[in-house]
Amino acid sequence: LYFKACNNGKLGITQTLGPGYKIMSKVKWLFGKLAIIKSQNFKHAISSKIDLDKARKLAFAPHINIGVFSLERDSPGWKSWQKNLEKTLKSGKIFGSEGLAMNISVYIDNIETEFLPLNCNWIASNLLPKFDENQQTFVEPYLPNYKIGIMHLAAGIWDGDKDMRLNKDVKINVKTLRNNIQSKSLRFSN
């Protein structure tokens, strides 16, 4: 899908938004209706000194997961991302700058984008997958239980103080489609 998505200069990418996600943004309620927005896009935009109107526009836009994306080599999306990355790196932190730059390219610059389904870039820390015992593969936890193509371990998958990204021996309990529990690693293995 990534190759097809980037046809004609479009960006092929996945948003971090889907069925079963319980929290999209953090908000600190001060009193009454007054709150401080703590969404990833807004927080990074403010620290990167992005114009307040643009930061507000990004505040509740679905965050874009840049762990995997596709762009043709001559796509105008590259210039937009480069321009925005220079801006975010100038005043912000290195961590998150590339993601913020891509979010600005999509939601502010309006580059042509093909949004791909979550199973193309599944963030396991947001929602654990299920395991299909018949197909021996991870699937989305909700019907129709599409097969997961890429498992993204952003934010880590932890067992005590051990992170699965760093320790190949870490396994977690995962529900199966038959309602069993299996101890599995979410890491790719041949």
Model-derived features: where do they sit?
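Glycosyltransferase catalytic domains, chiefly GT-A lineage
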Residues: 1-190
